[in-house]
Amino acid sequence: MSKRIQAKHKLDRRMGQNIWGRPKSPVNRREYGPGQHGQRRKGKLSDFGTQLRAKQKLKGYYANITEKQFRRYYAEAIRLRGDSGENLIGLLERRLDAVIYRAKFVATPFAARQFVNHGHIKVNGQRVNIPSFLVKPGDVIEVKESSKQLEIVVVASQLAERDVPDYIEVDHGKMTARFTRVPTLSEVPYPVHMEPNQVIEFYSR
C-alpha cells in the first residue's frame, strides 16, 4: 500500500468518516481511530477539538492542502464581504485541481493535483500547472489534446458517475469545462458534512 493511500486511510479513521466517499475506506468496515488505542470510546469534544477536526477534515479533503496555504484562504475569506465560511468554501472550489475533480476528468482530488502539476490542463487556452490557481466565473478549462488518451483520463471518464455540480458545465466528449459561478456550501457535493464556520472560529481564536 502506498504512503498516500495509507495517509488517506489514516485520516478517514481519525475522523471516523469516509471523507472522500471511497468504496475501500477503512471506516466502511470499522468506525474507530487509527493506532492501538483507536477502539477506546471517544469522549465529547471541546469547542477547540470540534474546530480542529473541522479544519483537519476540510483541509484533508482538498488533497491535504498545506497549513500555510489553508491559512491564506482563511485570511482571504474573512477579508471578503459576506459569510466567511461560505467565502472559504468558494475559494476552495475555485482551485483548479478542485474544478478538474468536480468535472470528473480524473477520479480523485489527489489525482487532480498531480494531473495539473504535470501540465495536462489549459485555462482559457493557456497551460496552467499550478493546482492552487483560482479560476473565475466564465473561465474555460480543458484537457490538453495530447493528454486526452492518458489512462487516468480514460478510466475516470468510463467509471466515474457524471454527477457534475451545477456550477460547472462539462463536455466530456471534448474534455472541456466552464466554471459558471462560485458555489455555496449547500451546492458542493461533499460526501460528509463540512463545517467551514468552525474552521473560521478555529483560526479566529
UniProtKB/Swiss-Prot annotation:
Q: What is this protein called?
A: Small ribosomal subunit protein uS4
Instruction: Give the organism the record lists.
Output: Methylobacterium nodulans (strain LMG 21967 / CNCM I-2342 / ORS 2060)
Pfam family of the protein (one): Ribosomal_S4
Q: In what ranges is there compositional bias, type Basic residues?
A: 1-12
Provide the organism lineage as a comma list.
Bacteria, Pseudomonadati, Pseudomonadota, Alphaproteobacteria, Hyphomicrobiales
Say which domain of life the source belongs to: Bacteria
Q: Which GO terms describe its molecular function?
A: rRNA binding; structural constituent of ribosome
> What does the UniProt function comment say about this protein?
One of the primary rRNA binding proteins, it binds directly to 16S rRNA where it nucleates assembly of the body of the 30S subunit. With S5 and S12 plays an important role in translational accuracy.
Q: Which family does it belong to?
A: Belongs to the universal ribosomal protein uS4 family.
Q: Report the GO terms under cellular component.
A: small ribosomal subunit
Q: Which InterPro entries match?
A: Ribosomal_uS4, Ribosomal_uS4_bac-type, Ribosomal_uS4_CS, Ribosomal_uS4_N, S4_RNA-bd, S4_RNA-bd_sf
Q: What gene, per UniProt, encodes this protein?
A: rpsD
Is RNA-binding given among the entry's keywords?
Answer: yes
Q: Keyword set for this entry?
A: Ribonucleoprotein, Ribosomal protein, RNA-binding, rRNA-binding
Q: Would the keyword Ribonucleoprotein be found if you checked this record's keyword annotation?
A: yes
The record's listing under NCBIfam families reads:
PRK05327.1, rpsD_bact
The GO biological-process annotations, alphabetized, read as: ribosomal small subunit biogenesis; translation
PANTHER family, from UniProt?
A: 30S 40S RIBOSOMAL PROTEIN (PTHR11831), SMALL RIBOSOMAL SUBUNIT PROTEIN US4M (PTHR11831:SF4)
